[in-house]
Regions:
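Catalytic core of pol beta-like nucleotidyltransferases
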Residues: 1-39, 50-97
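Short, hydrophobic beta-strand segments
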Residues: 45-48
Length: 97
């Protein structure tokens, strides 16, 4: 897991708040380095499914808001955006929230 110092119940509470605010479903945690646009060593990376109505602005907002709640940078990868080898491998690496 890439977030050893975050209490799981607090993490689940913050994820639920983001899922209530944005049309997104967080599937789980990804290993550090899975998200290409996140460079902070303390970042947390998630795999998510988009729900109807999710825009790019919503996705960015979910990353920022969840990052604010967790106190560190967050990266979110959408299952629908995975192609080829990544589409097969990343879902296998997900750790439940």
């Amino acid at each position: 897991m890439n977030a050893p110092d975050i209490n799981r119940s607090i993490l689940r509470m913050h994820v639920a708040a983001i899922e209530a605010k944005y049309p997104i479903k967080i599937v789980g945690l990804l290993p550090r380095g899975s998200v290409g646009h996140v460079f902070d060593d303390n970042a947390i990376e998630f795999l998510a499914e988009k729900r109807p109505g999710l825009s790019l602005l919503d996705l960015a907002g979910a990353e920022v808001d969840l990052g604010d709640l967790l106190g560190r940078q967050v990266g979110i990868v959408l299952v629908s955006g995975l192609k080829g080898h990544e589409a097969e491998e990343l879902p296998r690496l997900v750790e439940p929230v």
